[in-house]
């Protein structure tokens, strides 16, 4: 387990999908994270970046898909996603820069 000085090195980007957008009402947020990060590092990083209290973190490793190109086959990168549930009473995270 490598410790990183900046929590923004662990949390790479929010996942924008229909499923993750629907979970926002339940204070559940989905992020792309570094593949070598663990749940404890993800929890600490989210709490430091967004100043919220995290209740739980679930992770999923997604295999990169094989895609066909004009010259043959390529492969998308494999990613790791973290599904972060905020504690009850915690304020929502403003991901899109607009009022909730």
UniProtKB/Swiss-Prot annotation:
GO terms for molecular function: rRNA binding; structural constituent of ribosome. The keyword Chaperone does not apply. This is Large ribosomal subunit protein uL23. GO terms for cellular component: ribonucleoprotein complex; ribosome. GO terms for biological process: translation. Signal peptide: none annotated. The gene is rplW. InterPro entries: Nucleotide-bd_a/b_plait_sf (IPR012677), Ribosomal_uL23-like (IPR013025), Ribosomal_uL23/eL15/eS24_sf (IPR012678), Ribosomal_uL23_CS (IPR001014). Part of the 50S ribosomal subunit. Contacts protein L29, and trigger factor when it is bound to the ribosome. NCBIfam families: PRK05738.2-4, PRK05738.2-5. HAMAP family: Ribosomal_uL23_B. The lineage of its organism: Bacteria, Bacillati, Actinomycetota, Actinomycetes, Mycobacteriales. Keywords: Ribonucleoprotein, Ribosomal protein, RNA-binding, rRNA-binding. One of the early assembly proteins it binds 23S rRNA. One of the proteins that surrounds the polypeptide exit tunnel on the outside of the ribosome. Forms the main docking site for trigger factor binding to the ribosome. Belongs to the universal ribosomal protein uL23 family. Pfam families: Ribosomal_L23.
């Amino acid at each position: 387990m490598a410790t990183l000085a900046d929590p923004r090195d662990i949390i790479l980007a929010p996942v924008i999908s229909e499923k993750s957008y629907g979970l926002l009402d339940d204070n559940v947020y989905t992020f792309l994270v570094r593949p070598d990060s663990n749940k404890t590092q993800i929890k600490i990083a989210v709490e430091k970046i967004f100043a919220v209290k995290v209740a739980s973190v679930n992770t999923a490793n997604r295999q990169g898909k094989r895609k066909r190109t004009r010259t043959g086959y390529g492969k998308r990168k494999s990613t790791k996603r973290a599904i972060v549930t905020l504690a009850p009473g915690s304020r929502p995270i403003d991901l899109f820069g607009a009022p909730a």
